[in-house]
């Protein structure tokens, strides 16, 4: 059995008085991809916010490699090896591609050097070709590559990816998929929030389905593929 990389355990979370996560539990194993899927508004991005310390839970626990990190500030959770690629491609639009990566690398407190600015360029040749361009001049797909690269130069052990394929052309989605598969092969643990069900099933080893803030399915990808009723009921597709 894979070592537990990141776990949410019986999480209750609120936005003001709205109970948005109810006893949510799931674990991403070491060097495995956990696909976190569900309809819009199910609570997937909220789980990401809880995991990285942006939204402290009202109850429950977050653990990184069995170390409790619940209610630690985001920078402390990052120091335990957790990085987030958020929705919206949060990059410094007024900096060049190289400057974006260099700033993220300098901010890392982990000390590892597996991923450097140059190794990101090797993984994403398009970024190398545009290293002196402002991030604001990149296409949407290139900005997503840059957001992933910024997370990687922190050299995390756990990578959380929130809708990495959203709004991208099929060719760029294929590039992102290859990168995720490569990262898993290199031992990185990944939690993947993904609306593209086909992509999620292709990349994930394990699946958690959220519906109205609750986990309604937790199992392997193969187990979900054999359960059309669950897919139809909670995702609205066959």
Region spans (language model):
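ABC-type ATPase nucleotide-binding domains, specifically the catalytic core motifs of the NBD
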Residues: 16, 72, 97-115, 123-128, ...
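Helix-to-loop junction immediately C-terminal to a conserved catalytic motif
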Residues: 52
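The feature captures the beta-strand-to-loop junction immediately N-terminal to the Walker
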Residues: 37-39
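ABC ATPase C-loop
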Residues: 151-152
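Conserved ABC transporter NBD signature motif
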Residues: 60-69, 80, 113-115
């Amino acid at each position: 059995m894979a070592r537990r990389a990141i776990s949410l355990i019986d999480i209750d979370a609120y936005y003001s008085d709205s109970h948005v996560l109810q006893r949510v539990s799931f674990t991403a194993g070491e060097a495995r991809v956990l696909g976190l899927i569900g309809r819009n508004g199910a609570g997937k991005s909220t789980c990401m916010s809880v995991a990285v310390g942006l939204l402290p839970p009202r109850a429950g626990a977050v653990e990184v490699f069995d170390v409790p990190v619940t209610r630690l500030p985001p920078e402390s959770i990052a120091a335990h090896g957790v990085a987030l690629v958020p929705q919206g491609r949060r990059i410094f639009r007024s900096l060049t591609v190289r400057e974006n990566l260099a700033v993220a690398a300098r901010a890392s407190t982990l000390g590892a050097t597996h991923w450097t600015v140059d190794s990101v360029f090797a993984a994403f040749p398009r970024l190398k070709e545009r290293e002196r361009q402002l991030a604001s001049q990149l296409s949407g797909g290139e900005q997503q590559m840059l957001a992933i690269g910024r997370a990687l130069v922190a050299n995390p052990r756990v990578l959380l990816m929130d809708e990495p394929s959203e709004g991208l052309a099929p060719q760029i989605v294929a590039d992102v998929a290859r990168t995720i598969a490569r990262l898993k092969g290199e031992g990185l643990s990944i939690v993947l929030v993904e609306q593209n069900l086909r992509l999620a099933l292709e990349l994930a080893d394990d699946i958690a389905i959220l519906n109205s803030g609750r986990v309604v399915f937790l199992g392997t990808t193969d187990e979900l593929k054999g359960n059309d009723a669950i897919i139809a009921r909670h995702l609205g597709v066959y």
